[in-house]
Amino acid sequence: MNKILKNIINKSSINNVFKTSFNGGISSSSSSSSSYLNNNNNIIKSYNVQQKQQQRYYSSFEDDLSPKKLKEKILENETEEIRDFVRSQRLTKKTASPLEGMNRKERRKMTTKLYRNPDNLIRGGIVSPQPLIPAHIKKPKYVLGEPVIDFEIDDPIEIHTAESIEHMRVVGKMAKEVLEYAGTLVRPGITTDEIDKLVHQNIIDRGAYPSPLGYKGFPKSICTSINEVLCHGIPDDRPLEFGDIVKIDVTLYYNGYHGDTCATFPVGEIDSSSKRLIEATEKALYAAIGEVKDGALFNKIGKKIQLVANKYSLSVTPEFTGHGIGQLFHTAPFVFQCANEFDSVMKEGMIFTIEPVLVESTSPYAEWKMWDDKWTVSSREGGWSAQFEHTILVTKDGYEILTK
């Protein structure tokens, strides 16, 4: 195993780099007790409403472009070892095809596109209080107060039993149906908070629990990431605008198991670049799924995603990964969404997510930043991103998509 990776994987800060939370990784490492279930009243305690109902700060267009400012704003949990690892992935690992990036014409065209009016960049809105959970809904242990245990890259990968697989089929089908419902709500003028509330009720009506709600303090039932926001966007009162694209990530907990899926939806008519971005990302997902089979190396997934990204002159994000899933929301393995040389082997009965995020950028590896809500991750350049995700079962003859 890569020595640098071994060093960083044992640090608690690894949760802030690789995907141990939903949508590809980065999250707050502390779990707020205010997010746990109030057993007496059978509701989730709301965050301090006064604290939450204020404008969240975002600054893609402020003066953090200077090297000095950038250095000062490096995430507190992003250690030098982590940055060294990312550099090693970018510079020293063999890749699916040469990472020459864009040619001069492509780079000039992309640079012109990225330096657009900063007023078009996404600003955080007001986040409403957490929704209530009825007493009869079964909650995951982390909502009841049990700490989340972060997994490590060399942890054993679960081989699911026939009974477990059947549970995963049921919750996977539910997640698929809820995501489809969420997609029907997307239109100009609706807020992501309104979408969250409607989806939340749809999940509750099925007797399921929205896995993100209360996970390490996340305040909502789904993730909604608009335009240049890569992942973990918190639903708020910003209305969707004509021409936006929005990533909706849905995870359900039902009968003790989690099912996870995500898709990118257009808001009204979108431009050709956005259509191309969505098309490329969905192709990357299915190209990667095609590599899944008993005995295959996990690194084939990342290499295939990177091949598609290179073909479309789009960027990948090494820090965001897929993950194992089952009775736990996130578990081994790490499923890297970029070219890598890790040699873990897929085996029949394993279940994990594949969830590429492709980004418009002038570099093969997109730079990102985190908002002060400690969840929302956006492109530093302002390039838009798309994401698609499925939960996959390794079968004797290949794979089964549990969320399709």
Swiss-Prot record:
Keywords: Aminopeptidase, Hydrolase, Metal-binding, Mitochondrion, Protease, Transit peptide. Substrate binds at H232, H330. InterPro entries: Creatinase/aminopeptidase-like, Pept_M24, Pept_M24_MAP, Pept_M24A_MAP1. It catalyses: Release of N-terminal amino acids, preferentially methionine, from peptides and arylamides. Residues 1-58 form a transit peptide. The keyword Metal-binding applies. One of its GO terms (cellular component) is mitochondrion. It is found in: Mitochondrion. GO terms for molecular function: initiator methionyl aminopeptidase activity; metal ion binding; metalloaminopeptidase activity. A divalent metal cation 2 binds at D260, H323, E355, E389. Its EC number is 3.4.11.18. GO terms for biological process: proteolysis. Gene3D superfamilies: Creatinase/methionine aminopeptidase superfamily. Transmembrane segments: none annotated. A divalent metal cation 1 binds at D249, D260, E389. Its cofactor is Co(2+); Zn(2+); Mn(2+); Fe(2+). The keyword Hydrolase applies. Disulfide bonds: none annotated. Pfam families: Peptidase_M24. Belongs to the peptidase M24A family. Methionine aminopeptidase type 1 subfamily. NCBIfam families: met_pdase_I (TIGR00500). This is Methionine aminopeptidase 1D, mitochondrial. The lineage of its organism: Eukaryota, Amoebozoa, Evosea, Eumycetozoa, Dictyostelia. The gene is metap1d.
